[in-house]
Amino acid sequence: MSTVSGLKRPQSSEKNHRDRVFVRATRGKVQKVVREQYLRNDIPCQSRACPLCRSKLPKDSRGNVLEPILSEKPMFLEKFGHHYLIPDSNIFYHCIDALEHPNNFFDVIILQTVFSEISSKSIPLYNRMKRLCQEKTKRFTPFSNEFFVDTFVERLDDESANDRNDRAIRNAASWFASHLASLGIKIVLLTDDRENARLAAEQGIQVSTLKDYVQYLPDSEILLDMVSAIADAIASKEQVESGTKNVYELHWSMSRLLACIKNGEVHKGLINISTYNYLEGSVVVPGYNKPVLVSGRENLNRAVQGDIVCIQILPQDQWKTEAEEIADDDEDVVVSTAAEPDSARINDLELITKRNAHPTAKVVGILKRNWRPYVGHVDNATIAQSKGGSQQTVLLTPMDRRVPKIRFRTRQAPRLVGRRIVVAIDLWDASSRYPEGHFVRDLGEMETKEAETEALLLEYDVQHRPFPKAVLDCLPEEGHNWKVPADKTHPLWKNRKDFRDKLICSIDPPGCQDIDDALHACVLPNGNYEVGVHIADVTHFVKPNTSMDSEAASRGTTVYLVDKRIDMLPMLLGTDLCSLRPYVERFAFSCIWEMDENANIIKVHFTKSVIASKEAFSYADAQARIDDQKMQDPLTQGMRVLLKLSKILKQKRMDEGALNLASPEVRIQTDNETSDPMDVEIKQLLETNSLVEEFMLLANISVAQKIYDAFPQTAVLRRHAAPPLTNFDSLQDILRVCKGMHLKCDTSKSLAKSLDECVDPKEPYFNTLLRILTTRCMLSAEYFCSGTFAPPDFRHYGLASPIYTHFTSPIRRYADVLAHRQLAAAIDYETINPSLSDKSRLIEICNGINYRHRMAQMAGRASIEYYVGQALKGGVAEEDAYVIKVFKNGFVVFIARFGLEGIVYTKSLSSVLEPNVEYVEDEYKLNIEIRDQPKPQTVQIQMFQQVRVRVTTVRDEHSGKQKVQITLVY
């Protein structure tokens, strides 16, 4: 497509309106496309020192003039004077970690050109830039140079898009410098592009590389660690080009990869690295019954967990099974930046090809990197103690065992020993055994609660910054004094039902403050029951297309850790105005059923409402009240009706094939004052837990059907696909060999039935253990937009429901907020917002909240694991455990008491002579001969076996951190 540029000259202005004319030729036809671009002259510079732009400042929704962002007297540096910064796109792309430093880089102008370039390369980086603009103390401001008459530039005929953008950045910097010159404020253009810097200097623009600039800042030593990797990367590339020996095969070119994907020579997919063996990954490929195995350092070829890779299937005689050994820590440490000789490398695990081998492949290219900031600690063995404060190369050992060690350069090496730090990967050349990165920040001393919690939040990408002012400005002005209007003629009462006289209560975990749901039940004159589920009316406060709505969508969910909660919504809403607390009036969204004695639904209707909860119970308190026959008040009788009906509803679900799976859930008892862990206990589930669950499920199903009927293409639903039968192959074989049992997995109903039948009278816990392992064969449930799947694929496999959504927790889940908006439109309470009719936008939102949901779950589990370790610190516990995986050099056990999994290495069974180990693969068994006893003995370990283990925490001398150690008691 060729481009013709023209200038349209309206009578009012010659400069403010441009046409861009594109001439497109398709199949011999010429089509002219005209795109108009209007240029403005009223965009302010955002400097508080500038009197000329005062009249151009925008106003907020209340008509108040918004104050300029940039300070009146910006930072003074001897070389640059008082100045504002304009970084180019590459500075943000490569060095945003440095720009985010809390004590440096203030008064920064982000040009629209830069925003556009970054958004096309990396949406996560683009979002980080937007968040910087929301941080009041940093004073980062966007500037629409592409729409400003004095800074817009046309692309020249012989000019590349990149060169045009560089020129636009220089032009904007030149305008700012001229505009602010009389105020004594200078502009510094930050760029590491030599040609861009040369051209800027020729235009008289003050220019600096980032590395030169940070040398003048107070925290220069830390900042230099954060930016030096870019210069090192350039040097590394020059070294590769000069003939440095490669450790890995070169990746194929992008054009070759795309062509080979098209012709089927290679396959693309997301790579998952094994949690037991960092040298083994797998990729799900359409057409293969099992995930394709990628085994060994060379075959992984620099792929990192979560990368989108291209793989080439190896010849069948090179196919392998999954690793039979647990890969221990990488013991050989090499920090040289040159390619290492073969003798310095760790030998990859040797795997034997067997009759049931997996399709095996090698990585030939990477389509999309999943690099992120990684939390870990400096490997002490890589620190040269004699170097003092000079820069040296060290290795980061990431917390995530699936991630390789990361090489980075730092001047702070001795000070970083024993610290939790964050490092980002910059590149991984074929000549380097390890990826290269740069230091981002120090989180604090390892094993301190603050540092480990911060590390956990970063590792699982939990957004935990304070809510920005733009979000807080969306809250009601009355704050905690907000009340439901007393006058029912008030507009806020319009189309709301008054349910304040209903005997409504909530039942939640102890100490719950963000109460999403409440219930009631009563007998109707015709003998049927009225049952109501009342959900916090969050969407009354959180409106579409507001800063609060964007923030909630970005966070996706509230994250629950042992000692804290990371809220999706500001606390004023989550724990007060939206929370269905007792004894106060609250707005709600109610789902009301009429049911008969057998819990058959006669009719259902939905309405916005006003409720006044009569009581807030914990599960235990509600159970005690129901069980106390002295309590015959109407509220308690209503709770008994709810319990009776919930049991019928549950049985109906089970009869339809709903799965009763198991997952380990523990509760950490903490000190009330310090939040230090004191003990670990298994969560006790009561009938009231099931009571609440059944009615929440019923409400979600009822709402799902309603919004799908109203919006068949854009309803936000939740599906749980049936797992492929091959997911059960390994578990089926283990069951057959070790127990002589079999699971029927063709439907959820047959699976539920066979799970009930798999009972070992000698081992009461076996059935629970089997349900835990069956859960791991399942696919994850996911949010989706109804127009993207056929109705049969809406089904929720685990719940045995043909349709499902999430409606009942809008305080803590953004998916529920969307369902509330769609339901409100479906009952004609309000018109549908255009954003909820945009299928492509909803698909994007669903993908985002699916990701946030997964991360929140993993963060919660990691928090429990950390606190279990802290509760055990300094002590020794002997507990029953169950073998759930067997390798050549160890076995994995599950300790039900702590909900903890851990590895028992066979070498730990002897203190002097290493045991002789016979691995009986076909029987999932280890015969371990322990030789340093007065009389040698043989210990036998097999899948599902109950064993006694000793659990302690020990300080790892190599890493300097505490870790749980599990040994066999025999």
From Swiss-Prot:
**What EC number(s) does this enzyme carry?**
3.1.13.-, 3.1.26.-
Mind telling me which Gene3D superfamilies this protein's record contains?
Answer: 2.40.50.690, 2.40.50.700, 5'-nuclease (3.40.50.1010), Nucleic acid-binding proteins (2.40.50.140)
The cellular location(s) given in this protein's UniProt record come to: Cytoplasm; Nucleus
GO terms, molecular function: 3'-5'-RNA exonuclease activity; endonuclease activity; RNA binding; RNA endonuclease activity; RNA exonuclease activity; RNA nuclease activity; small GTPase binding
Domain CSD1, by residue range, is: 251-334
Q: Its GO CC terms?
A: chromatin; cytoplasmic exosome (RNase complex); exosome (RNase complex); nuclear exosome (RNase complex); nuclear exosome focus; nucleolus; nucleoplasm; nucleus
What keywords sit in the KW lines?
Cytoplasm, Endonuclease, Exonuclease, Exosome, Hydrolase, Nuclease, Nucleus, RNA-binding, rRNA processing
- State the SUPFAM superfamilies in the record: Nucleic acid-binding proteins, PIN domain-like
InterPro entries membership: Dis3_CSD2, NA-bd_OB-fold, PIN-like_dom_sf, PIN_dom, RNase_II/R, RNase_II/R_CS, RNR_Ribonuclease, Rrp44_CSD1
Cofactor dependence: Mg(2+)
Q: Does the keyword Nuclease apply?
A: yes
Q: Which residues form the PINc domain?
A: 83-198
CSD2 domain residues are: 394-461
Chain intervals for the UniProt region annotation (Not essential for function): 1-74
Q: What does this protein do?
A: Catalytic component of the RNA exosome complex which has 3'->5' exoribonuclease activity and participates in a multitude of cellular RNA processing and degradation events. In the nucleus, the RNA exosome complex is involved in proper maturation of stable RNA species such as rRNA, snRNA and snoRNA, in the elimination of RNA processing by-products and non-coding 'pervasive' transcripts, such as antisense RNA species and cryptic unstable transcripts (CUTs), and of mRNAs with processing defects, thereby limiting or excluding their export to the cytoplasm.
Please give the family membership noted in the entry: Belongs to the RNR ribonuclease family.
Protein name, please?
Answer: Exosome complex exonuclease dis3
Originating organism = Schizosaccharomyces pombe (strain 972 / ATCC 24843)
Q: Which gene encodes it?
A: dis3
